[in-house]
Structure formats: C-alpha cells, structure tokens
C-alpha cells in the first residue's frame, strides 16, 4: 500500500453469492443496436475468468504502487452440483485457487448445520469472518470444532465484539471484520450451541475496539443484505467501506444489455461507501480507495464488471456462434460496454475443475431419469395461472422415499422456496434435479403431530408468505402438500383461517381430527420451525432426520415412476390444496 503525502492507497476487489457457480453461465442478453433487436447468449463469469481478471487487477495495483485486497462477502455453498456432490470441498479448492484474503460467512453456508462449515474452514487458506457468531459454548464432543480453528474470526464474548484481521497499509493498518445475519436461526440451520448475536451492537463495539488498537481504516465484509448494509452505514460511524452480499444486487447500469439497472456503484452514506457485486460469479466489483491519516476516504472510484467470453451465440447451449454481420457488430458493441470486460479463463483454475470435479459433474449431467412431456411450472404463491405444478410432486416424493424406508408417513408438507425452478419439456437429468430444481442439500425427516398442529402449521406458513398479520420472511414459506387438502380464508381471525382440512388415508379423504396424531414428512429445515412453520416444534418427541436429501427423494420417485412428468400422470396426483 502506497503512502504519499499521508494518503494510503488501496485497491479492493470483491465477489459475493457465488453459490458454487464455478463454471461460466449461459447468459441471455437483450440488445437494441440502432433498431436491430436481438437476444443472443454469451458465456459469462465463472471462477477461471475471475482468476484472470484478479491477476490483471493485482498487476495494475502493483504498477500503481497500491496494495490489493480481494474478499468474498458470503454464500459460496449451495446452488449447483458442485456443492451437491462435493459438500464444500470444491468450494475450498476453488476459493484457495483465487487466493482471496478473506470471506464472510453466509446463511447458505449453514443450511446443513455447522459440520460442513467446520470441514470447509479446515480446508481453506484464508480467514472466515463471522464476527457476530458466538462459538464460546460450542459442544466439546464435536468432531470438527469451529471454536478451535484460528482461521474462524468469530465473536469475542469478553470484549463483545468481532475478532478482526489486519492488512499492512504502509506505516499503518487496514482492519477487516465480518458480520452475518443475526436472525440466522430463522432462515438457516446453525447448531443450537452457536447462536448469532446482534449485528448492529457488534459493529459498534468492534469499531470501538479497532480504534483502541490504533487503527482507523476499517472495512466491513457483510452478509446482512443491501438495505441492512445501508442502514448500518447510516447508524454506525467509523466504517470506511462495507462490502456486501446476500441481496444479489449488481450495482450499476447494465440495462443496455437487457440486465438490471441498480443504484450506482459505491453508495456514499455517513462517510461510508457501500458496494455489492451481483451473484453466481457472473461479475466482479473493484474500487480504488484513498484514505487520509484520520482514516477518512478522500477518494473513491470503482465499478462492477460483467466478465464475458468474446463471442455471442444463437442458442443457450452456446454451440452455434452468431457469425453474420449483425451479430459481429453486436459482439463488438457488447465488448465495448463500459461495464463489460472480456477475459480468457485462467488455465490453472480451469485445470482444477477439469481434473478434479468436472468429470463427475458431467456424468450426472448426462444421466437421464425422466422425460417431461410438457412444462411443469413452479410458482411460490398460487397466481392467476394456478399453484405450483412441481412443489406437490416434490412433497409426494418425500412420502414415497420415506415409505420405501419403512416409515409410516401419511402426508407431506414442503415450503415453496425449497423448489428453485420449473421443469421444461424434454429430458430431465440428475443434474437438473440436484443442481437446479432442488439444489439445497437438505435432508428430509419424519415426525408425528396432532391434527391441530397440522392446521396451525399450514396457517402459520401461509400467514408468513403473504404477511397476513405477521411480518413474514418471504413468499418461500408457502406450503405445498401431499395427501392433504384444505381451505384458507385470509379474512378470518388468526387461528381460524384453515378449514375443511382433510387427509387421504388409503383411498378415502377423511377429516383431520384435532387431537389425533398423524405421521408427516418435511425437510429438516421445515422441521426446525423456520419461516412460519414454528407450530411443527410441537411435534411428538424430536422426530427423525434421515440421510435422504430432497433431491435424492425426487430422483427416487422419478426412477420408480418415470412417467410421473408425463401428461397421463396428472390424474394420478393425490396431492392438493385449495
């Protein structure tokens, strides 16, 4: 880091919410070039392109005598087959290859509890920032203890602040700390012995402690979300830069490419700059920051860049490049867009994928388990076109898989947010299911609940999804079922909105009795009472969590009933809500 006339110069690059998108994405653009409209596809992002661009930026910083930092703002796990298959090992290898300086813990790192994070933290070569994660009461009998890993910069209970890292800045230091969602238990699955504490209070206390240590240049790497980052910047003094994630916001204007137009890169709030760089390794943010002796940012400039290949394609599979004059002109126009950087794939990073991970992923990508005769549409909340056509099938697969293992399940409830996409006509592969449709590697379980608890669960989930009398956590909680049907009246008083609740027992629909117990199945996430499902915590005993994932169950039912996605299977579907 260069210190000239008491100015400290830093270049910082950042990514967030990469969700195991190590390979490039086939990205469709919408272009209008002098009245010529076209919608070509382009190879976008991927870790090998990020590595190339980072190398260029490091060299630029070195030439300009600026120090260089590269951080990840959380959510590197769930999203593709690379996580479904390798459970964090590929993530550690690929992030190590990028040579990042630090990463903040995201909520999706904890979808499967602490154990995958603990194993990931043992493999990485960089600090994992988790400044409001209290590991002080972590159970001693765990195989991999986060509290004993010095790379994990968690909450310091004695000082009530985050542990931070420092990077040299000429004659001074830059401090970096991380914060994650403090309501983590509501949307993820952290172990009960490792709670998250208030992010705002932790931020204030941490800045005070960093100042006491004689450091006034402070960077927060946050996984709180874009609005929360801006609110924190307004409420807390002393932060130079907040590098954010969670909300997938791609700051800047990409509308000429048919993509989003968000606020300008580097929102300035209360002497703090706030940045975020999209999702899925499509883009990279970077900024030049100059600090004065008091730690104030006296110069800031930067941007988000979409990292693209050099050709435009006519199809999503990117097999046929556009070679006519219009596409060649469009290609040149895209390449000259101020927020686009065309770069090659770094051979070393690409080699890690090719040699260690791609062969197994390709094998699964080519393994066909079913044929879809028509589109099976997924929506979270039923709309004018109807409810999800997929979520009930997923719920049905839970019942099928659990019955195959001897569990006497009678119904299933699944949250809409656990299903991530629709199914289009054609071949359905293992990769489509485990990598796209049900990418969250969450197991399913079995439990016994009273009829009243079933009603309370359904009402709570819908109330949460539509914000009916509660401040909900999002539409993803909307419940889809197998072997249950019911009416929901939003106008009725809370606790009375579910009526005509029936369960399919054998071949007959029977009224659900309030005090009778029934055996159900849901994901382990739902069984923990997340997002409006808190009534399920009234289950008898603790329930059983199996080693069968959601994707495993759906693949199993399609393997046993390969025509389930055909036109003829619709009549056989015994799962509904009305």
Label every PLM stretch briefly.
Residues 1-308, 390-397, 412, 448, ...:
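Acidic, metal/ion-coordinating pockets
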């Amino acid at each position: 880091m260069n210190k000239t006339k008491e100015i400290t110069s830093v270049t910082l690059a950042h990514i967030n919410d990469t969700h195991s998108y190590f390979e490039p994405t086939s990205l469709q653009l919408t272009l209008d070039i002098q009245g010529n409209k076209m919608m070509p596809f382009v190879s976008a992002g991927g870790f090998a392109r990020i590595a190339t661009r980072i190398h260029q930026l490091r060299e630029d910083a070195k030439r300009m005598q600026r120090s260089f930092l590269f951080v990840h703002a959380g959510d590197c796990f769930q999203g593709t087959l690379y996580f479904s298959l390798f459970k964090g090992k590929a993530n550690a290898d690929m992030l190590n290859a990028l040579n990042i300086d630090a990463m903040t813990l995201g909520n999706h790192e904890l979808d499967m509890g602490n154990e995958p994070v603990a194993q990931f933290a043992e493999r990485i070569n960089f600090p994992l920032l988790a400044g409001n994660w209290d590991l002080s009461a972590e159970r001693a009998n765990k195989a991999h203890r986060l509290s004993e890993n010095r790379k994990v910069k968690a909450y310091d209970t004695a000082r009530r602040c985050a542990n931070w890292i420092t990077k040299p800045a000429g004659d001074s230091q830059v401090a970096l700390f991380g914060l994650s969602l403090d309501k983590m238990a509501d949307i993820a699955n952290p172990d009960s012995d490792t709670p998250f504490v208030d992010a705002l209070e932790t931020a204030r206390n941490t800045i005070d402690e960093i100042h006491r240590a004689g450091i006034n240049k402070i960077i927060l790497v946050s996984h709180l979300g874009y609005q929360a980052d801006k609110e924190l910047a307004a409420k807390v003094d002393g932060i130079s830069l907040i590098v954010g994630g969670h909300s997938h916001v791609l700051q800047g204007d990409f509308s000429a490419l048919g993509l989003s137009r968000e606020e300008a890169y580097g929102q300035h709030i209360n002497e703090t700059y706030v940045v975020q760089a999209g999702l899925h390794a499509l883009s990279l943010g970077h900024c030049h920051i100059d600090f004065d002796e008091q730690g104030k940012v006296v110069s800031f400039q930067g941007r988000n860049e979409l990292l693209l290949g050099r050709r435009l394609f006519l199809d999503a599979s990117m097999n046929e490049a556009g070679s006519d004059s219009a596409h060649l002109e469009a290609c040149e126009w895209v390449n000259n867009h101020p927020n686009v950087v065309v770069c090659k794939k770094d051979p070393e990073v690409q080699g890690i994928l090719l040699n260690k991970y791609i062969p197994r992923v390709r094998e699964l990508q080519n393994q066909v388990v079913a044929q879809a005769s028509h589109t099976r549409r997924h929506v979270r909340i039923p709309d004018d076109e109807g409810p999800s056509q997929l979520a009930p099938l997923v719920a049905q697969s839970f019942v099928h898989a659990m019955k195959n293992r001897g569990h006497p399940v009678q119904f299933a409830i699944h949250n809409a947010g656990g299903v991530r996409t629709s199914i289009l006509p054609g071949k359905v592969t293992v990769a489509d299911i485990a990598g796209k449709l049900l990418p969250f590697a969450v197991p399913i379980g079995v439990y016994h609940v009273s009829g009243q608890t079933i009603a309370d669960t359904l009402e709570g989930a819908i109330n949460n999804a539509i914000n009916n009398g509660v401040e909900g956590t999002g539409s993803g909680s909307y419940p889809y079922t197998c072997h249950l049907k019911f009416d929901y009246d939003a106008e009725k008083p809370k606790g009375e909105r579910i009526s005509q609740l029936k369960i399919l027992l054998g071949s007959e629909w029977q009224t659900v009795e309030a005090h009778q117990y029934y055996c159900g199945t849901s994901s382990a996430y739902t069984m923990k009472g997340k997002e409006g499902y808190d009534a399920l915590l009234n289950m008898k005993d603790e329930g059983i969590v199996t080693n069968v994932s959601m994707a495993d169950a759906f693949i199993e039912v399609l393997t046993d009933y390969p025509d389930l996605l055909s036109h003829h299977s619709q009549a056989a579907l015994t799962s509904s809500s009305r």
